[in-house]
């Protein structure tokens, strides 16, 4: 992942979720964890129109071993994380994933269900059930965002769980951090993949 010559190697992660699921927060925590993990350039940004609960939202995390000088994210990401699998029918999610990329979904289904003709790796984990099990529920809403950070760590190998846990701890009070870290760990352990994924040359 180190830079070669003058070219910046930037890893692009796109988050797809719905308003209220915490996708933007997850993107920001991942950026912070990547920085803790030693990446020199990190950014996180949301993309949505009128934000309302339940409406589709998109957020991006970008990180690089060298400072990021290109502000515009690439059209296709190395990793796409989907907080609500029903969005697969509502949004062209695969259109924003590189042909050899990694798709991570909050789903109780096996990863093979989401395999396509594209040469992608697929990872699934039932973050919703795990979040409910550990008590990540606020006003009836199950908070799955930090759980999927655990799935990201296991499936991608790009950011360590240790760094994710440190970033989570910096964003929540001690009691909430403990619950979120437990959810992330359990989701990490429960993550299933159709095959091992390795990062190819990331684009700018």
Each predicted region: which residue ranges?
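Active-site cofactor/cluster-binding pocket
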Residues: 2-204
């Amino acid at each position: 992942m180190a830079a070669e010559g003058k070219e910046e190697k930037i890893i692009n992660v796109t988050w797809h979720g719905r308003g209220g699921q915490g996708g933007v927060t997850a993107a920001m925590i991942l950026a912070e964890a990547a920085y803790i993990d030693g990446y020199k350039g990190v950014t996180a940004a949301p993309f949505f129109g009128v934000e309302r609960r339940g409406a589709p939202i998109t957020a991006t995390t970008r990180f690089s071993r060298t400072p990021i000088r290109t502000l515009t994210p690439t059209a296709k990401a190395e990793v796409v994380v989907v907080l609500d699998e029903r969005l697969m029918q509502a949004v062209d999610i695969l259109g924003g994933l590189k042909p050899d990329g990694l798709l991570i979904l909050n789903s109780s289904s096996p990863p093979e269900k989401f395999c396509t003709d594209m040469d992608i790796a697929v990872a699934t984990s039932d973050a919703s059930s795990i979040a409910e099990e550990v008590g990540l529920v606020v006003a009836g809403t199950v908070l799955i965002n930090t759980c999927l950070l655990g799935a990201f760590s296991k499936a991608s190998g790009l950011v360590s769980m240790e760094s994710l846990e440190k970033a989570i701890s910096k964003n929540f009070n001690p009691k909430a951090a403990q619950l979120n870290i437990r959810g992330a760990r359990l989701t990490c352990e429960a993550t299933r993949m159709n095959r091992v994924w390795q990062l190819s040359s990331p684009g700018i």
